[in-house]
Amino acid sequence: GYETLDEMFAVIAGILRSGAPRSYVYAYWPQLDSLAHEHGIHSDAVAEAFAALDAAFARLLDTAHGSDSLVIVTADHGFIDTTVEATIDLDDHPELRETLLLPLCGEPRMAYAYVRAGRERQFENTVRGRLADRVHLIRSEDVLRQGWLGPGTAHPALRDRLGDYVLIPRGQTIL
């Protein structure tokens, strides 16, 4: 295990230097995400944490050089600073809320809408008439067909999980 950034990279470097047989190493560093939530993505705290992470990662790549290792870095989500004013609250849009079978699902930056049978046109008209400047409205089948969630064949249950429509906020907006 590890508790500090340096310890995390030391553990990974130790595995790379050990000459052990092929293995999969997963490491997660939550500090950048935590600081972004607490201070905002443009804060000095986030910039300093990112610089430290970047420098430690560069040192790891130096260690990995020549080790026949594949290093992949990924993120589980992006960052956005937003405000209360940028939030679309369904309580402010009862004409939209009444078309929904369930509350919006998914996440604030990609909401899934389950629309009551027979209310699809009202839902579409309401979103286009009142929120078009703040959200993209996409039919769920188009999200899948256009590959928004990745290539390949979608799991059979995915279509049901997306609801009928996907709402993707523009700019700093969240739902």
Language model: regions and residue ranges:
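Feature captures the catalytic ectodomains and active-site-proximal regions of enzymes
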Residues: G1-L175
